[in-house]
């Protein structure tokens, strides 16, 4: 049985503590989780700098020039990449984003490398990052202490390379039919897969 490790409250950004609705904090992945992104490496960006990029890679950079761990009521909701188990909502979001990417290619946008990153259950989180559970089946990897966006991208890319498996989005969709996903409220179902 996997034990959830709770991180000390000191790792939270005290100035932003009232802005988020945090369900739990984890030192390891409590379930196998996935993330869709358009490139193999992390490409988070400052939401105020570029309106043309993939919105789910946007984060808020504070006035001090650093990314602070945060959950917001408006987009971007998480200040880090979102991971989800193979749930209905995850499948719907991934398929929608991949269909949208294919439409953009048809409209002449540049080819990218849409992938799904898989992080297995029990994988420890590096000290530079923290895993927050924000919703029923929604988790995000965020900086454990404020850092520059480039360093956050480097920490995430290194974590993906060392601890994750990267699969092409089309291949992942073909190997993971929607009918095999778990309802988001069936925590026992997706936690034990």
Mark where each language-model region is.
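NAD-dependent ADP-ribosyltransferases
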Residues: 2-193
């Amino acid at each position: 049985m996997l034990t959830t490790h709770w991180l000390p409250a000191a790792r939270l950004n005290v100035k932003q503590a009232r802005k988020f609705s945090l369900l739990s904090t984890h030192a390891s992945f409590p379930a196998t989780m996935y993330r869709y992104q358009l490139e193999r490496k992390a490409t988070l960006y400052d939401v105020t700098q570029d309106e043309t990029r993939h919105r789910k890679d946007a984060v808020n950079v504070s006035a001090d020039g650093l990314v602070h761990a945060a959950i917001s009521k408006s987009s971007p909701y998480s200040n880090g990449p979102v991971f989800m188990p193979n749930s209905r909502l995850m499948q719907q979001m991934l398929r929608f984003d991949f269909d949208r990417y294919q439409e953009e290619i048809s409209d002449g946008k540049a080819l990218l490398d849409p992938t799904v990153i898989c992080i297995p259950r029990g994988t420890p989180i590096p000290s530079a990052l923290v895993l927050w559970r924000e919703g029923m089946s929604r988790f995000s990897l965020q900086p454990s202490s404020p850092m520059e966006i480039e360093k956050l991208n480097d920490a995430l890319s290194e974590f993906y390379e060392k601890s994750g498996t990267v699969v092409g989005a089309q291949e992942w969709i073909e190997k993971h039919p929607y009918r095999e996903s778990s309802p988001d409220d069936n925590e026992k179902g997706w936690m034990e897969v």
